[in-house]
Amino acid sequence: MNKTYLPPQDIEGKKWYVIDAEGQRLGRLATAIAMIIRGKNKPTYTPHMDTGDFVIVVNAEKVTVTGKKSSQKLYRRHSGRPGGMKTEVFSKLQARLPQRIIEEAVFGMLPKNSLGRKLHNKLKVYPGSNHPHEAQKPEKLTIQTIPGGER
């Protein structure tokens, strides 16, 4: 019988990565971010523990989708009251709250339990190119989300 590896829980060992979302495909970018936040890119990955790193996403307003998704993809939210369902297409939400698009895509790929709720704090999304996390000395991480492309 195999035993699950139990890594030491040290917050100092967590890395910070900064990812530029300009021109990147939404789904492929969100998949890569979720893997880093969850810690699946490390040999010390443990399913029931937080072994992932922090991710800062800049230029969230410049993320792209393919096909007609910008006019057909719907984002829904509910106020909790009867008739309180609000729907918004991708292009309008991108103009209003561009960081919410990446947050929803990544959070949908994380576990729906207490560990998943803790992992939400590891994602920092900013619409512009500036972020307030220079003190953490984040590493620049490039992710290729365009198949056969230069990014």
Curated annotation (Swiss-Prot):
Origin species: Trichodesmium erythraeum (strain IMS101)
Keyword Ribosomal protein: yes
Stretches with biased composition (Basic and acidic residues): 131-140
Record InterPro entries: Ribosomal_uL13, Ribosomal_uL13_bac-type, Ribosomal_uL13_CS, Ribosomal_uL13_sf
Pfam family for this entry, one: Ribosomal_L13
Its biological purpose: This protein is one of the early assembly proteins of the 50S ribosomal subunit, although it is not seen to bind rRNA by itself. It is important during the early stages of 50S assembly.
GO biological process, one term: translation
Family in the record: Belongs to the universal ribosomal protein uL13 family.
Keyword Ribosomal protein found: yes
Assembly description: Part of the 50S ribosomal subunit.
Entry keyword set: Ribonucleoprotein, Ribosomal protein
Gene3D superfamilies documented for this protein: Ribosomal protein L13
Gene Ontology MF annotations: mRNA binding; structural constituent of ribosome
Coiled coil: none
Gene Ontology cellular-component terms listed: cytosolic large ribosomal subunit
SUPFAM superfamilies, sorted: Ribosomal protein L13
Location of region: Disordered: 126-151
Protein name (database record): Large ribosomal subunit protein uL13
